Amino acid sequence: MKNAARLTALLLAIAAGPTFAKQVRIPITRIKDVPVKCADEPLGTCHNRWHPGIKAVMDADLGDLVTFETRDAFDNPFNRATTPADVAAPNLNLIHPLTGPLHVNGAHRGDVLAVTMIDVQPGPDHFGYTVAVPGFGFLRDVFTEPAIVHWELDPLAKNGKTRYATSKDLPGVHVPLHGFAGTIGVELGLPEIEAAFLREDQLRRVEGFVLPPEPTDAVPAALCGPHGPARDRCLRTIPPRENGGNTDVKQMVQGTTLLFPCFIDGCGLSIGDVHWAQGDGEVSGTAIEMNAIVTVKVEVRKNLAAKYGNWPRLESNRSGVLRELEPDDFVATMGIPVKPAGVVMQPERWFHSDAQLTPLTNQSEDVTLAARDALLKMINLLTEPSTSPAPKPLTRVQAYLLCSVACDLRISNVVDVPNYVVSDFLHLDVFEKSADGNEDGDD
């Protein structure tokens, strides 16, 4: 984002108001610029489960500016020396380490917590990564081997220019900073915890892909660990829910306001899993992941949670906030719900038998299959020498990981039966240009 520093200063000035709001900081402990593990945090400012019994670590008043220091989504296991083999079996019990909860004074159950994003900066190590983990991601049946892209993150904007992430693993690619919190939310109340547990457990029992409560490596261990009183109801942070959480909505950038229903007094705001940038869909399961420093303003809209449907919302009155996320140049593929005969996708098994599905090459009204088709076509486009807009054609795994940070899956229609359309838009401005205006590497 151009002039990001100026925008941050403007947002800070607006947020502070004429009387200057108090500024609050929730710190974490770092060793040589890298955060210590969530479970080892001596300040007690980290947790990796949702439960209203998790105690607030800081208080803030309405209108305060609050800075959260955060870990990355996997609790910082990867670094510049990490190999693909090191990515093969990460500990998913550690996901996501969150900073908080923050108790907002004057906020009560039934209110709406308004959280305005003021600033998102990478942590002091200026390192990010994108990974493909076996068994996880949208195309986990196609990409079965581990992979990693290591990113160097521009520490400062120079002369108002755009800040980029670059990688030796993707030569000729630079991804601009559009930072946001992939996971941001409030604590659920006990009734909401029980409702979420029951519906997810019901889904798990019919072979849905669900991660149930897991006390191993849960933080705080005293509440959620193997001997904790809430070990069977401390919910995992991977699925988004009524409280927000791991929504991975890339539009939650500077100048937007997130609206969360408060399910407990004080709301219990937590932030983590921050991204330098992400494509709509986050198809590999990761964006450009980083530890970060996030500043927000907290306000309350009294007694509006029920009117807002007890569900999160996102809004902005800052002109051009979405336009800044759109590419100047793009190429897009279009997908419909088609597949090779013999391939059966797991979600369809809930509605049809394998005998019905196996011979089909077309399925009806299936947005997921259409998205898969569009993504596979984009990967083919990026890897085919005659069509690839990249400086050099990418390998298939390079293309998959690039799509996770720079391609936007968009639903184009859900009416033209049987073939709904999903389009996949690639931001061509992620490819560096040479002095003659061509992509680097062009003849």
PLM feature spans:
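Sec/Tat signal peptide C-region and signal peptidase I cleavage site
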Residues: G17-A21
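N-terminal, Lys/Arg-enriched amphipathic/low-complexity engagement segments
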Residues: Q23-P90
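Short, structured beta-strand/loop micro-motifs enriched in basic residues and often containing a Trp
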Residues: E41-H51, N91-T99, L235-N243
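A generic structural signal for residues embedded in beta-strands
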Residues: F68, V112-V115, F260
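Short, Lys/Arg- and Gly-enriched loop/turn segments at beta-strand edges
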Residues: A73-A85, V120-V131, G266-W276, S412-V415
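Intrinsically disordered, low-complexity linker/loop segments enriched in Gly/Pro
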Residues: D119-V253, L259
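Conserved mixed alpha/beta catalytic, RNA-binding, or beta-rich assembly cores of soluble enzyme
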Residues: R205, L211-S364
